[in-house]
Amino acid sequence: MNDNSFNQIKLFQSLFKGREDVFAVRWEKSSKSGYMPAYNYDMYHYRAHKMNGGTFQNYPHKTYLSLTDNELQKHFIGIQQIGVYPLLQDNTSWFLVADFDKQNWKEEAVNFLNACKEENIPAY
């Protein structure tokens, strides 16, 4: 990993700090798509489970993949699309996202930024 990649990862981790024990990956199947937790599992063992009528949802031998620098690097170079889980296990969060999409979205966004500034809350 070069210095630029390292700096990208550290910037991402500082802006989008969330759970580190799990992250989401994007999936596509037919005309549907979405995000699901990234898991580590033995595909051969799972295939046997599936052949016996099991599903991935009730497959007991899967564990979450941790959000590592390597997983972030794969995201940055386009190998995978990931999402973070911002809600921590203690029901707190390090960041929030605000969506302004009505007629007066610019004014609302400026008001939001001003309110954050008044409360010393970093906003970008």
Kindly give the residue locations of the regions a language model identified.
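Signature for HUH/AEP ssDNA processing cores
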Residues: 2-124
